[in-house]
Each structure stands twice: as C-alpha cells, then as structure tokens.
Amino acid sequence: HTGRYGREFKVSLTDIMKRILKEVPQLYRLRISSIEVTELDDDFITFMKEEPRIARHLHIPLQSGCDSVLQRMHRPYTTQEYYEKIEKIREEIPDVSISCDLIVGFPQETEKEFEETYAFLQKCRFSFLHVFPYSLRNGTVAADMPCQIDPQIKKQRAQKCIALSGKLYDTYQTQWIGKEADVIVEQCKEEGSKGHSSQYFPVTIA
C-alpha cells in the first residue's frame, strides 16, 4: 500500500513526496507506481495538481466493477466511491491519465456480474487496464469458496477486457494528436529517441 507509507512515523505520502522534491530539486519527475483509491486524499490531489514534477498518471487498482464481487473480495470501497474519486481527480487535474488493475473470474462471478464490470470499465474511461484472470492460491479464503470459475471462462473474460484495454488506450492516445507532451527521453537509437510522457504513455521522437 504505497499510500500508507510513513504512517507509522505519523507522516503522509504527500509529506514524503514534498520532502523528496524539496531536497532533490534536480529531480525532473516523480511518479507514483500504484495507489489505492481509499488512500487518495484531498491533500494528495491538491499537491499533485499544484506540483508539475508529479507525473500526470495514477494507477488505481479497481479489481472489479461490480459491487457484489468487491464485497466478496473484501475491498473497502464501492464502485460509486471509486468513480466519484477518479472524477474528482479529473476535475482537478484534467490532463491526468488513470489506469487500473482488474481481476476477472473471481470465485462465484456470474456472467451478469462480469458484464457489470465491463460496463463500469467503459464508464470510467481508463487510459489502459492491467487484466488478470483469478488465480487460486491455497490457504486463502477465496480458494475455499464454492463455484470456482472454469479456466476457459476466465480466459474468455480476460481476453474481452484486454481487447477493451486496447480500445481505451487508442482513444486516450488519439486525444493527444496535435498536442505537446512533456517527455523524458530514456533511449536514443537510430530509428529515434524513445521515452515516456508525464501521462506515462510511450513516445518515439523520430
């Protein structure tokens, strides 16, 4: 839980980020790899909005877009709470890119529940998805649940969401046609220089 870092010392992630950027002024960009939606407080959002060196990308695990599945997963939020949070972030930081983790085929996930998730993914307008078919882990509560999903069904659901991720990515990329992006160059080759934008999409400079 990245967002909980420092709590045992009574400091917040935002406090730590501020200190890093203050003590390392030459640091050009700071990106948070992944953070839970419940850990994105107003202080974090405001700091990200006001500090241009914070990458305009947030990877916020969702896991499921269906409330009944989230309850079985013991996730501490609802789809409505998740949606309201990412919309608040977009309102404050219009050029932000938001991606998520998704697990399909969690035990007892019905076709209707999966379709709810699929519709929610479209509603959220993510820039891309990290999709994982549920994998049984011995010793976990989920492993002992009845109605484990057939591997072929899990594969089909994962493929459908991966295809959606491609469409979402293309849509997001299209929004940047004709616009300037702030890119950190990571490789220089004959075919062009390559790097990532602040929104964490790859860029080739020919």
Predicted regions span which residues?
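Conserved SAM/AdoMet-binding glycine-rich loop
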Residues: 1-111, 122
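Structural beta-strand/beta-sheet cores of well-ordered domains, especially the beta-sheet scaffolds
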Residues: 28-31, 56-58, 96, 127-130, ...
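Thr-Gly-centered strand-to-loop micro-motif
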Residues: 35, 72, 129, 205-206
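Hydrophobic, well-ordered secondary-structure elements that form the walls
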Residues: 60, 101, 121, 129, ...
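Short, small-residue-rich loop/turn micro-motifs
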Residues: 61-66, 133-138, 197-199
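C-terminal, non-catalytic macromolecule-binding modules
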Residues: 112, 116-161
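Terminal RNA-binding accessory module
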Residues: 144-206
